[in-house]
């Protein structure tokens, strides 16, 4: 009996691919490649990462498809409803990058709050003293309030780690979070979170109602020296409103790891602003996290074998 065909559109960990090869015939290629076109009609599985858009147009090319797998957490690039209308299962790896993202957020907090300087040559005593006078953090973390917008897996781990350092953590979420999962963080309304926080870190999901959630009225509630970090989805923040707010507040900082679109273009309103720091979507970029995401192949094999997947896309 021949193996079902699985198209893989992006790089996966070699060990995961080797394992999958025992359960499916693997074809590697982007949706614009000849390899994809040749295999599409009979493909029963499709594995994507961040930038392959799975919509009706792509699904039309895959009439035998049974499962779409996202080697990652967010499902923004997959039209889950369109898949379900066609009886196609959608699976992902919801906890694969939690540790990586939390570590990255911690690094960004340190970047924002604790200036550092490394020397590549000896300095005279006067210059040494001058540097030490200039490179001074304005606060310690145990003096500050960290507001966590979105208290899912990553938000909860951020609360745990930040609380251990000494931040007083508050959070806002649409759901009631069990006290055991709050790690000492206190719930509040979204307006209060922006008004009371020294630092706001955004960890909401990709539901359409979160588009433009952080808008001009919400930004106006922030303190003039606040720090805003976004490692969730670019479309959550209104970039033009953010640029207008930031331009009048030289003491504030914005660190954006995610953007809408990606990559961002020359017209991005925050380009060139001294207190805006734009990163190319790096939060989950550890070899460990990328390998973890690759093991979505286990759920691909489960679906192809007629078994329920461990991590189906959530119902919304």
Where are these regions (language model features)?
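Rossmann-like dinucleotide/phosphate-binding beta-alpha-beta segment
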Residues: 22, 134-224
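Conserved beta-strand positions in the Rossmann-like core of class I SAM-dependent methyltransferases
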Residues: 27, 170, 235
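Short glycine-/small-residue-rich Rossmann-like dinucleotide-binding loops
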Residues: 51, 73, 198, 203-206, ...
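Beta-strand-loop-alpha-helix segment that lines the small-molecule cofactor/substrate pocket
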Residues: 59, 63-67, 78-90, 202, ...
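An anion/phosphate-binding loop that grips the pyrophosphate of nucleotide cofactors and donors
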Residues: 43, 62, 196-197, 225
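Phosphate-binding beta-alpha-beta segment of Rossmann-like dinucleotide-binding domains, i.e.
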Residues: 94-145
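An N-terminal-biased, well-structured beta-alpha scaffold segment characteristic
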Residues: 1-91, 215
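Rossmann-like dinucleotide-binding domain for NAD(H)/NADP(H)
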Residues: 225-316
């Amino acid at each position: 009996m021949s193996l079902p065909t699985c198209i893989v559109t992006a790089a996966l960990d070699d060990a995961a691919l080797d394992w999958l090869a025992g359960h499916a015939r693997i074809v590697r290629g982007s949706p614009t490649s000849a390899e994809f076109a040749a295999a599409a009609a009979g493909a029963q599985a499709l594995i994507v990462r961040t930038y392959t858009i799975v919509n009706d147009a792509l699904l039309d090319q895959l009439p035998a498809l049974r499962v779409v797998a996202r080697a990652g957490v967010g499902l923004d690039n997959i039209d889950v409803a369109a898949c379900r209308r066609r009886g196609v299962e959608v699976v992902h790896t919801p906890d694969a990058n939690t540790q990586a993202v939390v570590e990255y957020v911690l690094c960004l907090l340190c970047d924002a709050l604790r200036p550092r300087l490394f020397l590549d040559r000896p300095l005279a005593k006067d210059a040494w003293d001058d540097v030490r006078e200039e490179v001074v953090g304005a606060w310690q973390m145990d003096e500050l309030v960290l507001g966590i917008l979105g208290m899912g897996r990553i938000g909860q781990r951020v609360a745990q780690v930040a609380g251990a350092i000494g931040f007083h953590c508050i959070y806002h979420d649409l759901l009631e979070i069990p006290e055991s999962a709050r790690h000492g963080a206190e719930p509040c309304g979204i307006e209060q979170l922006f008004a009371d926080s020294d630092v706001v870190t955004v960890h909401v999901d990709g539901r359409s109602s979160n588009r433009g959630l952080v808008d001009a009225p919400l930004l106006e509630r922030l303190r003039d020296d606040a720090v805003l970090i976004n490692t969730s989805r670019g479309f959550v923040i209104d970039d033009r409103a953010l640029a207008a707010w930031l331009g009048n507040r030289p003491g504030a900082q914005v660190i954006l790891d995610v953007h809408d679109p990606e990559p961002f273009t020359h017209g991005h309103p925050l380009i060139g602003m001294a207190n805006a720091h734009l990163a190319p979507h790096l939060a989950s970029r550890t070899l460990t996290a990328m390998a973890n995401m690759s093991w979505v192949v286990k759920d691909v094999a489960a679906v192809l074998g007629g078994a329920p997947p461990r991590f189906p896309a959530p119902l919304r």
